[in-house]
Amino acid sequence: MMDIFNSVSESINILNNSVAPMDHREEHEGAPSDKPWGVNFSGHDFLVNSTSRSDIITSVEQVDRTGSCPICASKNDQGTSLAEAMESMVATRQLDSAMSFLSMVRPDLANWDVINYHFSHGIKDPIEKLEYQIDTMIDVHYRAGMAIGRDFAMMVTANGSQFVSPNEKNIKCLSSLTTGLTKLIQVRGDIRKMTTSKKNKRGTAAPL
């Protein structure tokens, strides 16, 4: 199952090194030919849009595993850890609920860096953890495609289609994104079948 990360490596590599659609007038005037998409992948466990708008990808950063998890380390006066209070959110992968909860009880921890870090190790079941990682990658691929399409459409609107054309690299970038997204969705479906089968087996265990 972990081969899924290798199967989308091409789209990740292209995104890391891609350029946006060029305005030919600027290009002829000697303007820089490379304009980053604003999308960067680094590794399998990553943080998306930490401290950023959720609808625009500005950064994807590798999860820092060198320090301790701030959520696990946080306890109240009665000795109950914050992680215990968030167990159900982690189990059902409710990131938005986790953000709302932390905003109320620990505003200093209410950021996506901390939440993604905790979720990345808080999900104990290996299949569910893989499903969480793939769901995150699907989200990144989808929003990257939307950002690229929006960027191109805005450039055409501003400059006219006769001045803007996607080069071969940009076309490959979008094509690879679509291919990678399709593979991820297929694997997610397979994993959910495995998860459902596993839960059904637990529920139909023979009585003692």
From Swiss-Prot:
It comes from the Viruses. This is Uncharacterized protein ORF30. The gene is ORF30.
